[in-house]
Amino acid sequence: MSTATALPPRRGRDFIARHGETVFNRIGRIQGDQVELHTPLTRRGFAQAEAIGEALSARMGESPALTLWSSPTGRALQTLAVIAEHLDLDWHATRQDVRLIELGFGSWGGETLTALTARHGPVVHPHGMAVGAPDGETYPAMAARLAAWLSDTHDHDGDRLIVMHGLSSRVLRGLMLGLPDDPYCGVPVAERLPQGSIVMIADGAESLIHRGMGAAAA
């Protein structure tokens, strides 16, 4: 899988954010890649998005030259709308790409972690990455679509903000940082971060911009 990451660092900084807490997150229910399943942010989720916006605004000022990217899920777009308002950027200019969505969980989508654990045993690896559903997307398949997005957008110069999900953002960051394959998932996986966190990747190195206060597993 690591051969898919053989790209030099992109010309520009990448700010990668994990969306805020949703009503499904709050009760431990799996969301996955179902774009049509709109699970809105909670008040805590909106506060997390506000905190990201404040952190970026303090760092970059008003109306920075920043291309907006997002997973097409409602929870990612809601989070980005709040951040964009802090930066005085046009949310309607957001570039949505389905390749940025969360891992697909097949028939597990919409199920609670408690119910799945009762039927199948532990469904979260020790480092926070979920166990893939039998009829769901595999981690190598997710890594392949994320690597394709990286390749297709590699020549886009300038800074960009990407709002996405817990599992998919960890794999995207792992690919960008050239990390070794994770023994549980078989693909590069970066450090886990709480919901409402944002990092910056520049010249192949990652730095934390804001650590969120979320508590979701990934």
Model-derived features: where do they sit?
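Active-site-proximal alpha-helix that buttresses catalytic centers in soluble enzyme cores
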Residues: 2, 6, 11-12, 17-89, ...
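Acidic, low-complexity terminal tails and accessory targeting/binding regions
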Residues: 2-13, 58, 89, 101-114, ...
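Generic beta-sheet signal
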Residues: 14, 66, 156-166
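Short active-site segment of divalent metal-dependent hydrolases/proteases
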Residues: 22, 168-169
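Phosphate-handling substructures
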Residues: 24, 39-40, 85-145
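Conserved histidine-centered catalytic loops in small-molecule metabolism enzymes
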Residues: 60-98, 119-123, 200-218
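Short, well-ordered beta-to-alpha junction loops that form the rim of enzyme active sites
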Residues: 70-74, 99, 146, 163-167
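Active-site signature of alpha/beta-hydrolase-fold catalytic machinery across serine-
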Residues: 82, 171-175
